[in-house]
């Protein structure tokens, strides 16, 4: 596990360097567009998480041998989606190294990312 963590940390550092190099060759407008595109990809991932929640509920209903009531379904759906969003989206959007890198590139981009993280929380 330790070696895996070290390898992942190296990837993150390399990714930051690559992003900085790309940004140095980009106009402010291109950087803003890249952040917009990044957020669109996040929206696509969120759609996948919403679909996964529906699959999870179907699996749960089959496992317990009965359908959930509307209230139960809404409660499970809300909790599961919040959990997935935090795990796969919000934790990354709020990661300190990521937010510092974005702040260096685009303060307005950081604001949009922070707003997105809050909306998903």
Region roles according to the model:
Residues 1-121:
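Non-heme di-metal
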């Amino acid at each position: 596990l330790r070696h895996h963590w070290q390898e992942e940390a190296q990837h993150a550092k390399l990714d930051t360097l690559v992003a900085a190099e790309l940004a140095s060759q980009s106009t402010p407008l291109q950087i803003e567009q890249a952040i917009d595109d990044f957020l669109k990809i996040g929206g696509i991932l969120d759609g996948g998480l919403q679909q996964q929640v529906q699959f999870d509920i179907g699996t749960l209903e089959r496992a317990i041998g009965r359908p959930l009531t509307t209230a139960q379904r809404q409660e499970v759906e809300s909790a599961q989606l919040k959990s997935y969003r935090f795990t796969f989206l919000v934790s990354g959007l709020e990661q300190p190294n990521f937010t510092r890198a974005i702040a260096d590139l685009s303060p307005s981009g950081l604001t949009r990312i922070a707003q997105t993280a809050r909306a998903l929380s």
